[in-house]
Amino acid sequence: MALPILLDCDPGHDDAIAIVLALASPELDVKAITSSAGNQTPEKTLRNVLRMLTLLNRTDIPVAGGAVKPLMRELIIADNVHGESGLDGPALPEPTFAPQNCTAVELMAKTLRESAEPVTIVSTGPQTNVALLLNSHPELHSKIARIVIMGGAMGLGNWTPAAEFNIYVDPEAAEIVFQSGIPVVMAGLDVTHKAQIHVEDTERFRAIGNPVSTIVAELLDFFLEYHKDEKWGFVGAPLHDPCTIAWLLKPELFTSVERWVGVETQGKYTQGMTVVDYYYLTGNKPNATVMVDVDRQGFVDLLADRLKFYA
């Protein structure tokens, strides 16, 4: 039986590839997709979800737009990474369908209510929508199997020295998620920076030769440009968000640890930092499964294998 999932995302090149991977995987049943502001403005990330589902011929999946700004802060976007549209690079189709006439939280709540079994929430942007769902629908917590997020880091940040972008955009929301008591799985920079796609991997995807694998290669062509900056020391482009989906499909590709994670919302230099109690110094009970390593080649092979689905 396929695992029911709700996908909350802010596409975003790597979010788009996470959608591609999820919908190529019969092990997963994507019940709905909601959009959050983050990599681009809320209007653009919603449009990008619709464009991707139009490309993938999955206009049957309900879509709703989410919060237009973080819980307590002004919105920050990553247009320097993802371009003016949020998905610069390939020529994507215009949407052929409309989002639901409801908010992301309403669609999430409806999906949870109607599911016969608990649903896994996969959140690859800021945690705003998920936090709003948790706060407004405590009666539905038992319908959530787990929350798998791309965000945070045990070590270095990528938006500030201490903070990863998704958590930095809305640290208050992330704190709500980590404190919820629901199992959380964290794909932070410690693992996603090891999930790099090299130029030869992109060419492998392109050579698969179907329309979707070609678009994925073109997304990666654009995404790689930002990551060529010497300051990162990368060989390729880190494919952050698909790590969440890959973990659901093949957890054996990942090394993870159970630890307590807190989110810094006040710090002078550390706002948005995920504080991971690696050495059990706080006495707090672990509240998260934290991914720390990945079999990079296995990850690339999984992507290549699933891209053939779209032939």
Swiss-Prot record:
One MF annotation (Gene Ontology) recorded for this entry: uridine nucleosidase activity
Source organism superkingdom: Bacteria
GO BP annotations listed: nucleobase-containing small molecule interconversion; protein homotetramerization; purine nucleoside catabolic process; pyrimidine nucleobase metabolic process; pyrimidine ribonucleoside catabolic process
InterPro entries: I/U_nuclsd_hydro_CS, Inosine/uridine_hydrolase_dom, IUNH, Pyrim_hydro_RihA, Ribo_hydro-like
EC id: 3.2.-.-
Recorded GO CC terms: cytosol; protein-containing complex
Active site, renumbered: H240
Disulfide bond positions: none
Broadest EC class assigned to this enzyme: hydrolase
Regulation of catalytic or functional activity: Subject to catabolite repression.
Keywords: Glycosidase, Hydrolase
The protein's role, per its UniProt record: Hydrolyzes with equal efficiency cytidine or uridine to ribose and cytosine or uracil, respectively.
Further remarks about this protein from its record: Strictly specific for ribonucleosides.
Family classification: Belongs to the IUNH family. RihA subfamily.
Protein name in the entry: Pyrimidine-specific ribonucleoside hydrolase RihA
Taxonomic lineage from the root: Bacteria, Pseudomonadati, Pseudomonadota, Gammaproteobacteria, Enterobacterales
Gene encoding the protein: rihA
